[in-house]
Amino acid sequence: KLCEIISFLHSQKPTPILFLDIQPKNILIKDKRIYLVDFGNSFYVDEAQNRQMLLGTPGYAAPEQYKYENLDERADIYGIGAILYFMVTGRNGDCKGARSLEFPNEITGKYKMIVKQCMSKDREYRFLDVSTIANNLKDLTNTDIKYSVGYKPLTISLVGTSPHCGVTTIGLALASTI
């Protein structure tokens, strides 16, 4: 479903939209539906070339986002690969590229190939479009990914409206029940 959302953004006419900040905290899941939030780093493709700032989140942003290089849809493809990597490892990628990624033994070569191609340091080796990623993912079988990898990350954010209102106490109480 994430691929469908990004593909929709990339298909906008006359100018595709780049999301440029695909990371776990920007993906919400409710009732088996996926929502992409925080479009603060998003640009139309032609506007992304004239940006005055570096964009993205370390571990999820494509290497070209850390430089003032021209950006295209392949920057988001890198982010999709980083999410796929996070889903099976619970770890962020890094800027060293796909060669440095370590996978659990339960993950087969087919899934690894998809992630590594998405996260290639050189964008010329990445998938050209999101629909190709989606098709490759659909071709995976249950034996390609075992769901018993064992790491299930959980993030709970608490915000207080004033100092000393008990957020720390509530956070500790929640943590002790998990």
Residue ranges and their predicted role:
Residues 26-36:
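Conserved protein kinase catalytic/activation segment
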Residues 51-64:
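Conserved activation segment of eukaryotic-like protein kinases, specifically the C-terminal portion
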Residues 106-121:
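Conserved C-terminal C-lobe helix
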Residues 150-178:
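Walker A/P-loop phosphate-binding motif and the immediately C-terminal alpha-helix
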Residues 76:
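Conserved catalytic-loop aspartate of Hanks-type protein kinases
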Residues 4-17:
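Protein kinase catalytic-loop region centered on the HRD/HxD motif
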